[in-house]
Amino acid sequence: MSKIIGKIGRLPKTLYEHKKKTIFFSFLGYLGADWVYRWDRNQGIRKEYAKIAVKYGETTVSPETRPKRVFVLVNVEGNSRGCFDQFNKNALPLFHLAGVQVDVVKADNQAQLEALAGAVDTQEADILYVVGGDGTIGTVVTGIFRNREKAQLPVGFYPGGYDNLWLKRMLPSVFENSDDVRHACETAMAVIEDQKKSVYAFELTTEGSTLAPEYGLGDVSAGWFRQIEDTRKKFWYFSMAKRRWAYFWEMLKRGPAPIECHVEYEETCAGCEKCRPKPIIEAPQWRWWHVLTGTPKYKNNDGQKDYTGIINEKCGEKHELDTHGAEFLIENEQMSDYSQIRFRMGGTDIGRFGVISDGFKRCSEGIVGRSTDEKFYGTDFLANSVAFKISALPSYIHRLYISSNATPKDAELTDRQITIRGTQKKLDIFLPTSIRLEL
């Protein structure tokens, strides 16, 4: 007993003499305790959502009622292939408890993902549920609208990406704080509870390309900030400081040479007889009983608004400008029955310290993909369509991020006109309205 007491008494001296080891093992102990705390908290969250989901599964229905069929399309490469494991923990059990029929299909590559998204229809499922991040969403939306004029199924999204920028823009109150699994569970509950919203895709075409147009819901971006955010992943060993270190390290090595481009854009219009075609109304089919009931009524199957008589003199008006900066961002803004384009270019004449300063502000507020300072963007306008031609793009940032999918390093991006336009291509999506569980 005296030996044990003696060792305890010498412990402070031992720790003092081995400062480096003490600091190292203390840090490991902190990380271990934090992991245990987060694991226990997430287990409790999953349990509470399971209690809600099982109530739907225990609801009495007719034997003839077919269960809701969900076709789960998984990008196995999403977020270093970790998103599928998280889906299995957070969303799949809720579907099973709610009595939902689930079919899971894994796509091995982007081409397969696009093909499957375009092929699935009401014969196989009632709902398409996509597991992946921003790039996966862009690929799925492209697959749907390259193969069909209209989407056949409503779509749900599991936030399996590294940043999930589009979901954060659509519903920041749910997806901005992703320290726990509540936001992931809510996406499954939105499908179970049939919480739907209509969104509209953008269309992107490239001059001289033989490929069909690309479609997406998120944004198109390029620049120093986007490149630095992309490289931060390799600094994982800096843990919570990896973003700040990425900004400091990249600006220590090189200065932010500007992007230069020429922009042509078309004035935005909420709808007029010039830009909105008159709705196509199919002639009704006659049946013998119409002799007794009268002439059948014409029906607008799409429920489209008729803009005949509405005149907007600025509709289709085109403008041109030359702009330059450290970051440009093109966002798909959702309107009532269409989407429009928001073009922003910022960081004009910004230096190394300016990039670090603005980057640190983004880190402090947990924002990725855009500046927290609205004055940062010297060029900012809304348009029906935007056509831009990049004349200067530094070699280190020679990439265009389309729905967070980066173009290859050897892609021809300069002196080629790229056109992005808002569309009326509608997609019904499942989106939670709020986080129901308070911690």
Swiss-Prot record:
Residues 65-208 form the DAGKc domain. It comes from the Eukaryota. Pfam families: DAGK_cat. GO terms for biological process: ceramide biosynthetic process; sphingosine biosynthetic process. It comes from Caenorhabditis elegans. One of its GO terms (molecular function) is acylglycerol kinase activity. One of its GO terms (cellular component) is cytoplasm. The lineage of its organism: Eukaryota, Metazoa, Ecdysozoa, Nematoda, Chromadorea. SUPFAM superfamilies: NAD kinase/diacylglycerol kinase-like. This is Uncharacterized protein F52C9.3.
